[in-house]
Swiss-Prot record:
PANTHER family: GAG_P30 DOMAIN-CONTAINING PROTEIN (PTHR33166). It holds the Pfam family Gag_p12. Signal peptide: none annotated. Glycosylated by host. Residues 76-536 are extracellular. Keywords: Glycoprotein, Host cell membrane, Host membrane, Membrane, Transmembrane, Transmembrane helix. This is Glyco-Gag protein. Its main location: host cell.
């Protein structure tokens, strides 16, 4: 029992219980406890003598000091961090955005960081992860970004443009981080003349060094007008204009060399229109279509099914200007028409082959001779071959015009009406194109003039139609006469300002008339009232 009491006393002393009990006896006024103290003094004494209380206070102080020390250490470390151009731009991000806005582009901070620290570094063109890249590395990144096709990065254009602007026109906070400019390359010093060494004797004779002639690139062809620019020597400069020595024959020069020599000898002050140069034996030179010509014609013109008139006019100008051969015509049709369209064109062209009387013939041998479907043996250098090609090109144009005609549809012709601001001439041209496209009739045929005249009158704009219908002797007018009258009416149209002024004057006159009528009504009412008052 005594042992238990001693253990309890030891634990009580460890946690300050005995002190608490003593203080409690003092607080309640136990006898023999000495003078009484205030509650605050008693509480402080209890906390001071208790080991657990001191431990709690120590933990509270440590929990306050540790974050403070951590914050101070972090501030010290951050103050010693190396500043890089990307981080510098983030510190002045408002100025970077202003620079981008001045160029009409928009940049985002998050993507700016990703590009500068990751994507542009991974391009392997020398873009550093830290530090300022030189301008040549910036140019390499620009080449990758502006690359055509799927290899480019159009979404990164605003960012590299802004970076280029900061590098070429740097603000004050960027200049300290730019690499120093490269010193100018010194000019090479002129070499001082070396003293001439005395001639040395040699046991063997010195032979002049000669370069072996280069092998010709083109095969030898004496009849070819082309020259080998790698092996043929340039023509000599013109000397005196004296007559050539007798007995010597001037060798014939190539066409290009002679043209260059004539340009140097006789500089023309004015351009001259000269005929096409002929090759050897007065043979005309042949120039086939290039791939770029065919590509441009197909790219910049509508398909035949969409606008056959425009494509027919293009092919007509090509045939007249280039005078192509049979092979060239097939290449042209292959590039500009579909398989079904080519079939229709060739079929219509073979229908137009003239016979002996000048009218279309049905004889197969005559048709095959004039418009063959397989490659004929026509030599464009002979008059007979050129005549065959001329007839073939004419029939090809006739086939294009015949294939351009669609099934008769007069409803489509009636839908072509004159626009509000369209001139009569352009309206007539559209009307003729509709006749060619939707009817089998030729609008230029005098037998179809009456139909075209009626369509022109009734499909014109209302003001022109009303005045054309009131013309005297309308039956004797030709299409050109009606076009002149329509042009006069169109040119006498009032402008929008004149029409507005006319409507305003009409409204003003109407208001004045209404005002007068109201005045008369009021005067009548007043007079009647006065008469009633007098009678009463």
């Amino acid at each position: 029992m005594s042992g238990a009491s001693s253990g309890t006393a030891t634990g009580a002393r460890l946690f300050g219980i005995s002190s608490v009990l003593g203080e409690y006896r003092v607080l309640i006024g136990d006898e023999g406890a000495g003078p009484s103290r205030s509650p605050s003094e008693v509480s402080f004494s209890v906390w001071y003598r208790s080991r657990a209380a001191r431990l709690v206070i120590l933990c509270l102080v440590a929990s306050f000091l540790v974050p403070c020390l951590t914050f101070l250490i972090a501030e010290t470390v951050m103050g010693q961090t190396v500043t890089t151009p990307p981080s510098l731009t983030l510190d002045h991000w408002s100025e970077v955005r202003t620079r981008a806005h001045n160029q009409g582009i928009e940049v985002r901070k998050k993507k700016w960081i990703t590009l500068c620290e990751a994507e542009w570094v991974m391009m392997n063109v020398g873009w550093p992860r830290e530090g300022t890249p030189p301008l040549d590395n910036t140019s390499q990144v620009e080449k990758r970004i502006f690359a055509p096709g799927p290899h480019g990065h159009p979404d990164q254009v605003p960012y590299i443009t802004t970076w280029r602007s900061l590098a070429t026109d740097p603000p004050s906070w960027v200049r300290p981080f730019l690499p120093p400019p490269k010193p100018p390359t010194p000019l090479p010093q002129p070499l001082s003349p070396q003293p001439s060494a005395p001639p040395t004797s040699s046991l063997y004779p010195v032979l002049p060094k000669t370069n072996p002639p280069k092998p010709p690139v083109l095969p030898p062809d004496p009849s070819s007008p082309l020259i080998d620019l790698l092996t043929e020597e340039p023509p000599p400069y013109p000397g005196g204009h004296g007559p050539p020595p007798s007995g010597l024959r001037t060798p014939a020069a190539s066409p290009i060399a002679s043209r260059l020599r004539e340009r140097r000898e006789n500089p023309a002050e004015e351009s001259q229109a000269l005929p096409l140069r002929e090759g050897p034996n007065n043979r005309p030179q042949y120039w086939p279509f290039s791939a770029s010509d065919l590509y441009n014609w197909k790219l910049h013109n509508p398909p035949f099914s969409q606008d056959p008139v425009a494509l027919t006019n293009l092919i007509e100008s090509i045939l007249v200007t280039h005078q192509p051969t049979w092979d060239d015509c097939q290449q042209l049709l292959q590039a500009l028409l579909t398989a079904e369209e080519r079939q229709r064109v060739l079929l219509e062209a073979r229908k137009q082959v003239p016979g002996e009387d000048g009218r279309p013939t049905q004889l197969p041998n005559v048709i095959d001779e004039a418009f063959p479907l397989t490659r004929p043996n026509w030599d464009f250098a002979t008059p007979a071959g050129r005549e065959h090609l001329r007839l073939y090109r004419q029939l090809l144009l006739a086939g294009l015009r015949g294939a351009a005609r669609r099934p008769t549809n007069l409803a489509q012709v009636k839908q072509v009406v004159q626009g509000k601001e369209e001139t009569p001439a352009s309206f007539l041209e559209r009307l003729k194109e509709a006749y060619r496209m939707y009817t089998p009739y030729d609008p230029e045929d005098p037998g179809q003039a009456a139909s075209v005249i009626l369509s022109f009158i009734y499909q014109s704009s209302p003001d022109i139609r009303n005045k054309l219908q009131r013309l005297e002797g309308l039956q004797g007018f030709t299409l050109s006469d009606l076009l002149k009258e329509a042009e006069k009416i169109y040119n006498k149209r009032e402008t929008p300002e004149e029409r507005e002024e006319r409507l305003w004057q009409r409204q003003e006159e109407r208001d004045k008339k209404r005002h007068k009528e109201m005045t008369k009504v009021l005067a009548t009412v007043v007079t009647q009232n006065r008469n009633k008052d007098r009678e009463e």
